[in-house]
């Protein structure tokens, strides 16, 4: 090994070659190890899904007879889950966005999304849980985080991520935003252009 090292070091061409190969190989190694053991179970009747997943031990499951017409799944982190139930219909320009570790997005059986629905679970251990038979119209945002920290005068963070619970048979009208920590009861109807914070 020392002989090879001396040879490479004495020859400027070989030295540059090894140097540049290491620069290329290291990011490749990171990319390969950063995508270990991600599992996707797609049982959909029809699916058009764009997946951008970086991390390890992430799990995506799409239920039986679901129809997905234009969903982007973006994951950055590890041990995250996206579970779409059976008989769901997800329209075009929808996105599920996860950043952080141990986050979950669960869509119950027979849910329908019209189009442009954005579900965002961020930070650590937060989740979005939609019960069965929920109807989401267009331009809906549901999120578990503010996407940035806020600190008080004692430098303590005051806006941690919180789980969102939406019970079954909920209808969410257009242009509605559901913020972190919200619980919505069974059979509720959220009016157009609402911002739900509690």
Question: For the regions a protein language model found, what residue spans apply to each?
Answer:
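Short, intrinsically disordered, charge-balanced linker/junction segments flanking boundaries
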Residues: 85, 194-198
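Terminal amphipathic alpha-helical/low-complexity segments used for targeting or macromolecular assembly
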Residues: 1-50, 56-59, 65, 133, ...
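Short, recurring structural edge motifs at helix starts
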Residues: 48-52, 71-74
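Flexible, glycine/small-residue-enriched loop-and-beta-strand segment within the central core
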Residues: 61-182
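Short, hydrophobic/aromatic alpha-helical segments in well-folded domains
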Residues: 174, 191-192
